Structure formats: structure tokens, C-alpha cells
């Protein structure tokens, strides 16, 4: 459990105009916001932009937040909407990002190449999933959210969350099994 005021208290203080309180909320939820935006968007820079736009929109709408409800789903719903809006606005890209590979010395070039290949395949497999499955995988596996929390955020029943997670993992497993067969 983190120390200091809880999210509801910080949101109340932010609604009263205390920008430092909102800054604490940003610090607490920035990682989750970026990861969820990344599940919707193809480019890391776009995900960062969407997360920032989501925080700005949340700051502007903080007085509409219901402190009886958890803060993170309210915020991430805004971030997802911002990511979807950004995706619609940026239908054509002229540049592509090149992810950095291993920077620290240690692994051999062959090991680094294998890790980069696996990372590329995993990113490609995630990108090939439907948006809702990507969001479910990110929230469940990367953020540790419960099925009910994810369902509440996305407006779907728990059983649908479980089903989406199952189908997403199966698709990822098939993609990665193909990679292992190629490497053997």
C-alpha cells in the first residue's frame, strides 16, 4: 500500500485547484496510462501523446470524477478515448520508430538479436490482436488488474474479459510457437 493520501482525496484536492495533488495522481498512474495507450496505438510516441492528452483532459474534468468510484478506471477510460481519437487523427504516418535494442554490455550479439526478434514478434502479435484484447492483456498481465476491474473500465461482463484474455493469449502463444519452431 502506498503512503500518503488516496486517489479520491487527491482528486478532491485537485478539483479544489491544488495542482500538486493532481501531479501526484499523474506520477501514480503515468505508467498504466502509457501502457494502455500503447495497447491502442502502434507508435510509442503516439502513446505518450495520448497519455499526456488524457491527463490534460482528466485535469479539465476532475470536478466530474465521482470519488466513490476508483480513480484509475475513470482516468484510463479518458486515456483510451484520447488514444482512439489520436489514432483517427493520424491515419497516415511518414516516419516509423525504431525501438532501441540492448544497450548495456553483457549479452552476446546473437542473444541480443534473438531477444530483439522475440520482442519484435511479440509486438507484432500484440498489434495483430483486436484493440479490446490488447487492452485486456495489458491491464491484466502488465497492470495486474482483476477481471471485474477491467470489465468495469471497458463496460463488459467479467466472463467476456476472461474470454478476451483467453483468445488473446492463445493467439500470442501460436505466434510465439511459430517463432520457436523457426529457431529450432
Residue ranges and their predicted role:
Residues 33, 37, 62, 66, ...:
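Hydrophobic-face residues of short alpha-helical interaction/recognition segments
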Residues 101-127:
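Acidic, proline/glycine-rich intrinsically disordered inter-domain spacer in sigma factors
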Amino acid at each position: 500500500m502506498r503512503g500518503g493520501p488516496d486517489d479520491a482525496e487527491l482528486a478532491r484536492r485537485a478539483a479544489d485547484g491544488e495542482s500538486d495533488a493532481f501531479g501526484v495522481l499523474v506520477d501514480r498512474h503515468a505508467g498504466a496510462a502509457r501502457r494502455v495507450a500503447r495497447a491502442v496505438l502502434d507508435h510509442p510516441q503516439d502513446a505518450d501523446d495520448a497519455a499526456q492528452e488524457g491527463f490534460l483532459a482528466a485535469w479539465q474534468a476532475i470536478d466530474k470524477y465521482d470519488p466513490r468510484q476508483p480513480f484509475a478506471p475513470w482516468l484510463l477510460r479518458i486515456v483510451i478515448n484520447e488514444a482512439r481519437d489520436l489514432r483517427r487523427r493520424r491515419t497516415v504516418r511518414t516516419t516509423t520508430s525504431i525501438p532501441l535494442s540492448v544497450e548495456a554490455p553483457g549479452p552476446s550479439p546473437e542473444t541480443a538479436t534473438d531477444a530483439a526478434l522475440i520482442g519484435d514478434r511479440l509486438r507484432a502479435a500484440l498489434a495483430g490482436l483486436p484493440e479490446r484484447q490488447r487492452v485486456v492483456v495489458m491491464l491484466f498481465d502488465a497492470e495486474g488488474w482483476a477481471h471485474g476491474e477491467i470489465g468495469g473500465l471497458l463496460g463488459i461482463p467479467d466472463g467476456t474479459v476472461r474470454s478476451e484474455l483467453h483468445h488473446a493469449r492463445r493467439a500470442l502463444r501460436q505466434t510465439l510457437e511459430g517463432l520457436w519452431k523457426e529457431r529450432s
